Amino acid sequence: QTGAKAPRKALANKAARKTAPADGGVKKPHRFRPGTVALREIRKYQKSTELLIRKLPFQRLVREIASDYKSDLRFQSSAVAAIQEAAEAYMVGLFEDTNLCAIHAGRVTIMP
């Protein structure tokens, strides 16, 4: 009976040594392989329909550009929302076309 208990204890010690980190008890944070998080984000944003540019910074940009043409312009909130919707749709289409061009040329990275 005593002979059977000793190996179990040795196995338990061996398993404990394997799971314990080698650098004195400080565990490294978990990291995904390169590209995994990017693919997950691509799937997430392709499923979603909400606007991705923050509303207030976009509104400030619209007002700044419009002030170059005419001062003291006022905007309905629905007009700014329509401009933002169109701008984001245009940018998504542009990135889709850019990605197709990069794939065609045998590249992965797109650059401005």
Swiss-Prot record:
Region spans: Disordered: 1-31
Keyword Thylakoid: no
Gene3D superfamilies from the UniProt entry: Histone, subunit A (1.10.20.10)
MF terms in GO: DNA binding; protein heterodimerization activity; structural constituent of chromatin
This protein's name: Histone H3-4
Quaternary structure note: The nucleosome is a histone octamer containing two molecules each of H2A, H2B, H3 and H4 assembled in one H3-H4 heterotetramer and two H2A-H2B heterodimers. The octamer wraps approximately 147 bp of DNA.
Keyword Lyase: no
Keywords assigned by UniProt, alphabetized: Chromosome, DNA-binding, Nucleosome core, Nucleus
Function text: Core component of nucleosome. Nucleosomes wrap and compact DNA into chromatin, limiting DNA accessibility to the cellular machineries which require DNA as a template. Histones thereby play a central role in transcription regulation, DNA repair, DNA replication and chromosomal stability. DNA accessibility is regulated via a complex set of post-translational modifications of histones, also called histone code, and nucleosome remodeling.
Gene name linked to the record: H3-4
Cross-referenced InterPro entries: Histone-fold, Histone_H2A/H2B/H3, Histone_H3/CENP-A
Compartment list: Nucleus; Chromosome
GO cellular component: nucleosome; nucleus
Primary localization: nucleus
Pfam family, one: Histone
Superkingdom of the source species: Eukaryota
Similarity comment: Belongs to the histone H3 family.
Spans traversing the lipid bilayer: none
